[in-house]
Amino acid sequence: MKAQELRTKSVEELNAELVNLLGEQFKLRMQAATGQLQQTHQLKQVRRSIAQVKTVLTEKAGE
């Protein structure tokens, strides 16, 4: 999701998105640890998405 789209969401929606992404990251990390993850680029994408959501939350907290 693009940062501009994230900025239009409310804080509650962003927190829900963050929880969802953290759960997805956990599942991907477990798959990678057991050798089941074929598309390793997903880890990078999820990590980047988490950073984007956290950045937007910090911006909203400063407003």
UniProtKB/Swiss-Prot annotation:
InterPro entries: Ribosomal_protein_uL29, Ribosomal_uL29, Ribosomal_uL29_CS, Ribosomal_uL29_sf. HAMAP family: Ribosomal_uL29. Belongs to the universal ribosomal protein uL29 family. GO terms for cellular component: cytosolic large ribosomal subunit. CDD domains: Ribosomal_L29_HIP. The lineage of its organism: Bacteria, Pseudomonadati, Pseudomonadota, Gammaproteobacteria, Pasteurellales. GO terms for molecular function: structural constituent of ribosome. GO terms for biological process: translation. The keyword rRNA-binding does not apply. This is Large ribosomal subunit protein uL29. It comes from Pasteurella multocida (strain Pm70). PROSITE patterns: RIBOSOMAL_L29 (PS00579). Keywords: Ribonucleoprotein, Ribosomal protein.
